[in-house]
Amino acid sequence: RTAPSAHPRAHVLTARTLEICEDLGLGDALRQIAPPLERWRRFRYCDRVDGADYAVADHGAAPAWANLEAASDQRVQHISQPVFEALLRRAVADADVETRYGRRVVDVGLGGDGVACVLDDGATLDAEYLVAADGPRGAAAGVVLAAATDAADRVPGVAHHLDAPALQHFVSVAFRSRDLAARLRARPAMLYFVFNQETTSVVVAHNLDEGLFNLQFPVFPPAERPGDAAAPRNVRREVRALTAAPLADLKIESARPWLMRARLADRFALDSHRAFLVGDAAHEMPPSGGFGMNTAVGDAHNLAWKLARASAGAANGRDLLASYERERRPAAAANVALSVDNWRRGLLIPEALGLPPRALDLAKVAAPTSAAFKTTTAAARAAVLARAATPHVGVTEVVAGRRELPLFFPHHDLGLRYDGASARAAA
């Protein structure tokens, strides 16, 4: 990338992440940009974002909120990842940090006393340590994974990575509309789960003041091709299906297909303790619950001070670096498992409406082309919703029983502790 991505992605900062930010002196800045709780405390399950609700989950009234308040002076916040990252970049602007854009690592040499990173322009960077935070298919991460326990070998880093099967294909759409923001001020929410004849999708209200939203809708290969689903004409059709009336000022900012995976690297570090995996390079998980970015922050916080001590020549520096994988891998494993469970809980709502995911799998077989698939699924949605005289009843039961996707997770957020070779959620 030649510049940071402005595409909205993660948007929930947990209490633990905010505690870390407070320690770094970023607490006041985050509180200034955070929207009020009233705007994002709810999840709405609806036929249109500006239409009728099947049910509303008010997480601000959930027992978990009180548990978090009792455990920490920090509160969960709803802040878009690009906004959070911009704040972090400003915080290090005056530090001894050099940021380069438009460069890619193509090879890494691993040795007992350091690392050498070769860039795509031919330049070589020598360093004591390598932190591979370049995502699940990054070159630096590939080297760490491919090198396994033999850190002395110089392994090309481009073609080495562990793939995991996709749980689901999606298209993510960033769009702006002050018209939509005005319609939603009387019915605010963080997430709008939309179920109607034209679409089954989720809308994230990132910023009502600026009219910034993110739409996530599923794609079902081979009946649908992700690239075609992200094409402008189809994206506009999906956005149009969200509202009762067309938006007067719709602006599509960006659209990109992506794969939802659940993956955990076998190793987070090499035995030489010269190279480490952090964030998505080490683990991928469904966005359900918002653990991806927060787990990455926990990784970075755990590793940063240990690297500082080791680089300064601390006598126990090697032992500290060895503890990174021992502490963070079990923590990440727990969050991956919870995120998968949350994703499955989220499927209870369409099932309550008579739209089980299995029906879409069958539709892929019955309608192997994109046009036929859309026709088949639209007809199925219409038939199911028409048959359900009171479609909200099943959804209300799921929400009233708190079986839907939660927003707060006190045990996983603040209850995690490191205990020797394991990490677990404290009661």
Residue ranges and their predicted role:
Residues 101-115:
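A conserved short coil-to-beta-strand element within the FAD-binding core of flavoproteins
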Residues 64-75, 215-222, 258, 283-284:
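Short glycine/proline-rich turn/loop motifs
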Residues 31, 98-100, 251-253:
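General small-molecule cofactor/ligand-binding pocket signal
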Residues 308-426:
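C-terminal helical "tail/cap" subdomain of flavin- and related membrane-associated enzymes
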